């Protein structure tokens, strides 16, 4: 058959200019020098943590925690992160942002003018505080409840209502049908402060985190600074297993129909279910062409 005659495709080579390392605590880092444009760099921290890890009484906490990363850390109290970055031309919502998805949460500081070492150090310190040193002050949490309540309210359009009807049927028997990151208004308005702190301590930990720095930087210096700044962060005792949720097989085609009086258009989604692909298999050309 054609499938049997298909030659084995080679693996995708790792860019030799990317410095990849892992600290003893499990945190992974990726650093690459790139002079286009000059004197600019991007900083990321990615967490393999999203709304899928929430329990029913935590729905919305992954997204809420993302918001709280801009509301006070040990080294940048209050709006300190936003205020300091604005002094170097990095603006919230433009070059400074984050997103929460079902499976991951990613924070970015982009287009940073790395014209002196102190700026690089401070951006890494922000990543450090996001990773391990959020304040999560009660007054700030309560202030953010109103912000996220409004985000939830304005997001309750026809498409969201249709998603909430269709997803539990499309992903029947799986948490994926019930974990849109915005969560539920009951949780947003009423969760106890400690619930958010517990979620942070449980899941924001080195073995689930990766640092990415790309730009006009000295790779050796950045690597040394990451080792100096992040190596002290300890894994929690008896860390919870990061379970990767599955979606049950189905023999018959699943068909779901959702209607809403405010949606005048017909929208059709066709989803093809396939076995989960392990990360190590994603580095081959075969994965890209399949």
Question: What residue spans do the PLM features occupy?
Answer:
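An aromatic/glycine/proline-enriched structural segment found at the starts
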Residues: 5-6, 173, 210-268, 272-276
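Short, surface-exposed beta-strand/loop micro-motifs that present aromatic residues
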Residues: 18-20, 28-34, 197-202, 252-260
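Mature N-terminal segment immediately following signal peptide/propeptide cleavage
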Residues: 7-45
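Extended catalytic-interface subdomain
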Residues: 108-112, 131, 256, 264-290
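Short, solvent-exposed loop/turn segments at the edges of secondary structure
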Residues: 24, 38-40, 89, 100-104, ...
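Active-site-adjacent, His/Asp/Glu-enriched structural segments that form or flank metal-binding
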Residues: 38, 47-161, 190, 194-208, ...
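Histidine-acidic residue clusters that define the catalytic metal-binding segment
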Residues: 5-19, 107-110, 117, 125, ...
């Amino acid at each position: 058959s054609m499938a049997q005659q298909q030659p084995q495709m080679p693996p995708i080579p790792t860019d030799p200019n990317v410095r990849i390392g892992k600290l003893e605590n499990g945190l992974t880092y990726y650093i690459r020098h790139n002079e286009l444009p000059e004197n600019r760099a991007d900083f990321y921290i990615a967490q393999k943590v999203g709304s899928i890890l929430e329990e029913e009484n935590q729905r919305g906490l992954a997204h809420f925690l993302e918001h709280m990363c801009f509301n006070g850390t040990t080294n940048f109290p209050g709006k300190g992160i936003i205020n300091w970055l604005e002094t170097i031309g990095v603006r919230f919502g433009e070059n400074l942002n984050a997103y929460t998805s079902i499976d991951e949460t990613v924070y970015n500081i982009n287009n940073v003018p790395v014209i002196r070492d102190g700026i690089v150090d401070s951006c890494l310190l922000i990543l450090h505080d996001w990773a391990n040193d959020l304040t999560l002050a009660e007054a700030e949490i309560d202030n953010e409840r109103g912000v996220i309540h409004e985000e939830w309210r304005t997001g309750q359009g026809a498409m969201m209502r249709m998603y909430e009807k269709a997803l539990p049927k499309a992903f029947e028997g799986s948490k994926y049908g019930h974990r849109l990151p915005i969560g539920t208004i009951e949780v947003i308005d009423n969760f106890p402060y400690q619930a958010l702190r517990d979620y942070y301590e449980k899941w924001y930990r080195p073995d689930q985190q990766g640092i990415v720095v790309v730009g006009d930087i000295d790779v050796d210096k950045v690597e040394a600074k990451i080792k100096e700044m992040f190596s002290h962060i300890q894994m929690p005792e008896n860390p919870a297993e990061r379970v990767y949720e599955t979606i049950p097989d189905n023999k018959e085609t699943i068909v779901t129909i959702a209607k809403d009086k405010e949606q005048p258009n017909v929208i059709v989604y066709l989803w093809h279910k396939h076995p989960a692909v392990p990360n190590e298999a994603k580095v081959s050309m075969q994965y890209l062409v399949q």
